């Protein structure tokens, strides 16, 4: 088992649903975890598929909650968005962009391939300073409440297994293969360096 706790980041596009559900579950399990989005803006479903609610990453979850409450309380209660924002504001004040974070992590989990590509591209564009490895793993999770919950438990189980390895560098590939077979999902995995 690693001598220090695993430093984990979970990343989706808007730091709202998938990354926050995983953040919530991982922090309840005692992990050192942060969550992020990679998008240029935060997007939440609106009254129609072509009319999303778009916010800046500086907007707090509380401000988004109050804005949607004012716009259409019934719609955003029924589709679960207000409930999700209520959970989010109990975890942290506002969404965060991965590209603006300079903290170091041991493991970064992304929730879709496009986000994985953005995270890897960002890490590879940074100047290497410490040569400390960071494992980036993609777990494809559909962006809905049910899949976010299932995906969060899978991410949590994966983190618990990695936390208990003797040698993460040499055991992670085999571990991911076991998880692929067990879950029926395919994981992308690469190593970047800080």
Curated annotation (Swiss-Prot):
Q: Which residues form a coiled coil?
A: 160-186
Write one Gene Ontology MF term: RNA polymerase II CTD heptapeptide repeat phosphatase activity
Q: Name one GO cellular component term.
A: nucleoplasm
Q: Could you say which EC number(s) this protein's record lists?
A: 3.1.3.16
Example GO biological process: co-transcriptional mRNA 3'-end processing, cleavage and polyadenylation pathway
Compartmental location = Nucleus; Cytoplasm
Enumerate the UniProt keywords alphabetically: Coiled coil, Cytoplasm, Hydrolase, mRNA processing, Nucleus, Protein phosphatase
Catalysed conversion reaction: O-phospho-L-seryl-[protein] + H2O = L-seryl-[protein] + phosphate; O-phospho-L-threonyl-[protein] + H2O = L-threonyl-[protein] + phosphate
Q: Which InterPro entries match?
A: RNA_pol_II_suA
Instruction: Give the primary localization class.
Output: nucleus
* Oligomer status and interactors: Interacts with GTF2B (via C-terminus); this interaction is inhibited by SYMPK. Interacts with RB1. Interacts with CD226. Interacts with SYMPK.
Q: Which family does it belong to?
A: Belongs to the SSU72 phosphatase family.
Role according to the record = Protein phosphatase that catalyzes the dephosphorylation of the C-terminal domain of RNA polymerase II. Plays a role in RNA processing and termination. Plays a role in pre-mRNA polyadenylation via its interaction with SYMPK.
**What is the designated name of this protein?**
RNA polymerase II subunit A C-terminal domain phosphatase SSU72
């Amino acid at each position: 088992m690693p001598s220090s706790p695993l430093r984990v980041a979970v990343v989706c596009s808007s730091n709202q649903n998938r990354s926050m559900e995983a953040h919530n579950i991982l922090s309840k399990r005692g992990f050192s975890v942060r969550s992020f989005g990679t998008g240029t803006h935060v997007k939440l479903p609106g009254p129609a598929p072509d009319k999303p609610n778009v916010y800046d990453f500086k907007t707090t979850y509380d401000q988004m909650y109050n804005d949607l409450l004012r716009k259409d309380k019934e719609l955003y209660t029924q589709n679960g968005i207000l409930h999700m924002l209520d959970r989010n504001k109990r975890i942290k004040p506002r969404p965060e962009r991965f590209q603006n974070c300079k903290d170091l992590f041991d493991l970064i989990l992304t929730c879709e391939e496009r986000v994985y590509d953005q995270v890897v591209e960002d890490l590879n564009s940074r100047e290497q300073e410490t040569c400390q490895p960071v494992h980036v793993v993609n777990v494809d999770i559909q962006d809905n409440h049910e899949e976010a919950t299932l995906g969060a438990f899978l991410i949590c189980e994966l983190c618990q297994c990695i936390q208990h390895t003797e040698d993460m560098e040499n055991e992670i590939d085999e571990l991911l293969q076991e998880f692929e077979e067990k879950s029926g999902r395919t994981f992308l995995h690469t190593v970047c360096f800080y």
